[in-house]
Amino acid sequence: MRGPLSAWLVKHGLVHRSLGFDYQGIETLQIKPEDWHSIAVILYVYGYNYLRSQCAYDVAPGGLLASIYHLTRIEYGILDQPEEVCIKVFAPRKNPRIPSVFWVWKSADFQERESYDMLGISYDNHPRLKRILMPESWIGWPLRKDYIAPNFYEIQDAH
């Protein structure tokens, strides 16, 4: 089932895949990494002026990595429930690269850095893409399903 935003994107020739609606009735769309930056700018101009959250997850061991964006359209003076959309961008595990939306929504800064730190997704054109939670010397991506955690003594000896 296609939602209003998906219908608008189709009308304007913007490539995406509708994933239906989540349990709260929020429209969910899949965007290809190569199309994400231009569609992000279009969504901002369309009125999605607030990045509520960005997160990432490992779809399956050895599979794709996903970067999720929850966008809200806040209109001043409108007290009703704001319009929301969930965007999913999937990247290959081997070289996961997704355009950063830092220059569209500044709130993506720490959120994209955390996704990089935990899953190794590289956000192209991010101004400060470096580890934010783990030490710079940390090897690997702790939230990947195929990550092998070092035992306690290895961590203790490293410091």
From Swiss-Prot:
A Gene Ontology molecular-function term? NADH dehydrogenase (ubiquinone) activity
Per UniProt, which keywords does this protein have?
Chloroplast, Membrane, NAD, NADP, Plastid, Plastoquinone, Quinone, Thylakoid, Translocase, Transport
**Record keyword NAD present:** yes
The subcellular localization recorded is:
Plastid, Chloroplast thylakoid membrane
Gene Ontology biological process terms, A to Z = photosynthesis, light reaction
Query: What membrane topology is annotated for this entry?
Result: Peripheral membrane protein
The record's top EC class is translocase
Q: Might you report a single GO cellular component term?
A: chloroplast thylakoid membrane
Q: Known EC number(s)?
A: 7.1.1.-
Instruction: Fetch the PANTHER family from UniProt.
Output: NADH DEHYDROGENASE [UBIQUINONE] IRON-SULFUR PROTEIN 3, MITOCHONDRIAL, NADH DEHYDROGENASE UBIQUINONE IRON-SULFUR PROTEIN 3
Per its record, how is this protein called by name?
Answer: NAD(P)H-quinone oxidoreductase subunit J, chloroplastic
**What's the source species for this entry?**
Populus trichocarpa
